[in-house]
Amino acid sequence: MSNEIDDVCEILEYITNENSVPRNIREAANESSQLLKDEEKDQSVRISTVLGKLDEISNDPNIPVHARTLIWEVLSKLESI
């Protein structure tokens, strides 16, 4: 796994463990992290799937500002891979 994906997974795991983030956002972050770690699928497929999932949750009105900023950071890193 590349360093960028490791960095992204680390941020997603932080969101997953953050209690101030709503459960649906934490679950989506956890699923995204697991998808990125799944070596059986092609990297471009994994990244595009995660981009779609995270883009959807970044528009959730209940997401705290700090978590939204982290998700935007993840999206930016994934788009640059």
Predicted segment positions?
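Peripheral, non-catalytic segments of secretory and membrane proteins
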Residues: 1-81
